[in-house]
Regions:
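N-terminal pre-transmembrane cytosolic regions of membrane proteins
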Residues: 1-140
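Extended alpha-helical interaction modules
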Residues: 92, 102-257
Length: 261
């Protein structure tokens, strides 16, 4: 993967990259994905595990596996996958959050988002909640049907977002609305993808929703601080104007105290 952005021809036509650009872009492809044959139902949770919660969650997952005779994650593992009966669990630990992604059995002819996500999420109760939940996604992979256009009725029309893959092999939709059960619903219509490609797309869709939520986490605090910041900016402007007009030492000292208080 090139770290350069070319804007024309020649050796001097590349934009200077940020020193962390390659690392950030590589993160998207650093985690291996698993093949997902359609149809499939994926329930994805992201929890705030800052501080001591991260280590505690790892310890309880190890104990969870050991008590069931399953091979636990290694101490250095950041990604882990295990099978519980017919359910697949994928666990990922990041710097500030941890995800539990459950792929649960689904009937071939099951209607979209049926049965309910809450009834399928019972396996999440088998492990101790690692921290406050930030993200809960109900992603349903369905195979193309004759009445494909009917999916629009599953979502709020005022916020419905729909996209199609470049070759038309997949269509995905969401309205970003939280259901009464607390989930964001994403529908992925498979029009002939391989299980590997479906798995890759599932991971990217879950990443988009997870990081979209995390990116907005600081917004309430920004709103709370906005009046104080506006007041500080106003006072800074006033002091700057006084500095331009003042030649008195005592007055200058007073303004310095105001700036550094």
């Amino acid at each position: 993967m090139s770290n350069l952005v070319m804007v024309g021809g020649g050796n001097d036509s590349a934009l200077a990259p940020h020193p962390l650009r390659a690392t950030i872009l590589g993160e998207v492809h650093a985690r291996p994905f698993s093949a997902v044959p359609a149809p499939a139902r994926i329930l994805h949770f992201a929890f705030d595990t800052q501080g001591d919660r991260s280590a505690a969650d790892r310890e309880q997952l190890i104990a969870f596996c050991q008590t069931r005779g399953l091979v636990p994650p290694l101490p250095q593992d950041k990604h882990f996958r295990v099978t519980l009966g017919g359910t697949q669990l994928r666990w990922e630990q990041h710097s500030e959050f941890t995800t539990y992604t459950w792929e649960v059995p689904v009937e071939d002819k099951a209607s979209a988002f049926h049965p309910s996500a809450s009834s399928l999420a019972i396996p999440m109760r088998l492990v101790r909640q690692p921290g406050p939940v930030l993200v809960a996604v109900d992603l349903h992979v369905v195979q193309q049907s004759q009445n494909e256009s009917g999916f629009v009725n599953l979502f709020d029309q005022t916020s419905l977002a729909v996209a199609e893959s470049g070759d038309g092999a997949a269509l995905y939709a969401t309205d970003f609305k939280v259901t009464p059960e607390g989930f964001i619903r994403i529908l992925l219509i498979d029009r002939g993808m391989s299980p590997n490609r479906t798995g890759s797309m599932v991971q990217h869709l879950l990443d988009i929703e997870t990081y979209r939520t995390l990116a907005l986490l600081g917004l309430p605090e920004a709103h709370r601080l906005a009046p104080s910041i506006s007041l500080a900016e106003k006072r800074l402007g006033e002091v700057t104007q006084r500095m331009r007009r003042s030649d008195d030492l005592d007055d200058n000292n007073q303004m310095l105290n105001e700036l550094t208080a």
